[in-house]
Amino acid sequence: MSPQTRAEIAGLLERHGLSPSHRLGQNFLADANITRKIVTVAGIQPGVQVLEIGAGTGTLTTALADAGARVVAYEVDARLAPVLEEVTAGLDVELHFVDIMGVDLAKELEGGPWTMVANLPYNVGTPLVLDALRNVAVIARFVVMMQREVAERFAASPGSKDYGLPSVVAGIHARARIAFRVPPQVFFPAPSVDSAVVVMDRVPAPPGAVRAIELAAAGFNQRRKMLRRSLAGVFEDPVTAIRSVGLEPTSRAEDLSAADFLRLALA
């Protein structure tokens, strides 16, 4: 049986002589209601293939498997191997104890579609999700719990304070939304920040996707500069290119939608 409360997780770790790693940013999910909500928004049904990143103490891992999913779970902390092996015994769960940042998911994941379910610290979450959106087409749905401010960047609208490159990448490759917010007290130990679950459903890559993201990266690298300056290194004549698609050279990257960057990519 998987741990569902802070006390159960603390007891399980203590029994194995373990404690959460501050270095790894470990905050283990310890709330059955939040676990059920994640399983629901992920659309888990029998036969669904789930890539779980950050299995931790297995609270979500076991819930996914109990709902009928085939779970391939990655956990960077090999100390947790006996814990996860204990709580997932008899379930359709395949465990890997490696750093996911060193795994070529496009090669490792066979067939599809896959649903990524993850509880990620900031330093891992953003680059991992951006890479998977761009390069791992077999992942059809992303259900990712991260620090709230980070999660909101993937679903932000042009002109908002959270809007940036993650928003554009998500806007090009998926339809993103914040499913719900998660308070600190549902974790063990409790983090100092709120979290949120962002859901992204993949859409077919449109023409110009790679170029559009390159343009967005250049624009947000100098986000306070007007496009005519921030894109000077990627267009021979940026003013003409920008105007050719009905945009203003005095605009900034934060003013452009994903669709705007796609139009500009084809200029």
Please give the residue ranges for each predicted region.
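Catalytic cores of RNA-modifying enzymes
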Residues: 1-218, 243, 263-266
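An accessory alpha-helical subdomain
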Residues: 196-202, 207-240, 245-248, 253, ...
